């Protein structure tokens, strides 16, 4: 079993981006769990839109990471090239947060479920805020990368940060194809039959419609059996 972002899962299955020419197809979807939002965080008041990132120092995640490709997708939707239009920095979440705190970068791409602790801290201590995407560019992004969903981060998620429109990918459980069908069935059943007793904040986002909504990688037979019992037909190999 493993936990992945839906976009990275698609890269692996299709042999694209960081898996270019090396497809991995011996796994299946178990369930989608919750959304992980692409959050563009900045403390620079001159940055109002993604277009304003041109000429700025921007952390776009570790090279080859899921965040890196999310950043490239969004920059590309706005006609920006990460090699020529921005001063790209390749930092993970923690280093990006530290660099924003110290004023060493202008903005950072963070892909994680909101609220994210690092952004909460920056919003409180530095007045950081999030950059919104506009519908026109979201639509262009979804044409080439259908695993993105439009997502609105509500006002109040972070102190002083207004409602922000962005895109999100899914956090997904996957399993090797050779994992026993009954074991996978029991895992999915245990999660969704006991969702009300789960302590993590993200548990409130568990939803069968969402869990059964993955289309880019087929479902494991054990998961498909559980969803069929609940009235959902999902693709299998």
Q: What is the predicted function of each stretch?
A:
Residues 1-54, 62:
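Short, glycine-/small- and polar/acidic-enriched structural segments
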Residues 7-11, 36-37, 46-48, 60, ...:
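Solvent-exposed loop/turn segments at secondary-structure junctions
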Residues 24-27, 35-37, 55, 83, ...:
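Extracytoplasmic
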Residues 35-102, 213-222:
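Bilobed "Venus flytrap"/periplasmic-binding protein-like clamshell domains
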């Amino acid at each position: 079993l493993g936990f992945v972002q839906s976009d990275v899962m698609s890269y692996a299955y299709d042999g694209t981006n960081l898996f270019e020419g090396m497809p991995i197809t011996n796994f299946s979807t178990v369930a989608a769990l919750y959304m992980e939002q692409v959050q563009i965080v900045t403390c620079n008041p001159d940055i109002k839109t993604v277009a304003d990132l041109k000429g700025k120092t921007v952390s776009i995640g570790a090279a080859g990471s899921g965040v890196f490709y999310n950043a490239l997708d969004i920059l590309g939707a706005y006609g920006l090239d990460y090699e020529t239009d921005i001063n790209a920095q390749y930092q993970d979440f923690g280093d990006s947060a530290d660099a924003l705190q110290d004023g060493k970068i202008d903005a950072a791409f963070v892909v994680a479920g909101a609220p994210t602790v690092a952004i909460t801290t920056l919003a409180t201590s530095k007045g950081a805020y999030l950059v919104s995407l506009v519908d026109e560019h979201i639509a262009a992004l979804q044409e080439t990368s259908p695993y993105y969903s439009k997502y609105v981060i509500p006002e109040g998620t972070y102190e002083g940060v207004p409602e922000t429109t962005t895109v999100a990918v899914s956090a997904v459980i996957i399993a090797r194809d050779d994992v026993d069908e009954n074991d996978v069935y029991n895992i999915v059943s245990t999660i969704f039959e006991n969702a009300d007793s789960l302590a993590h904040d993200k548990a409130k986002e568990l939803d069968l419609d969402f869990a059964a909504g993955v289309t880019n990688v087929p479902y494991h037979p054990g998961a498909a059996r559980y969803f069929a019992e609940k009235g959902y037909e999902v693709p299998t190999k």
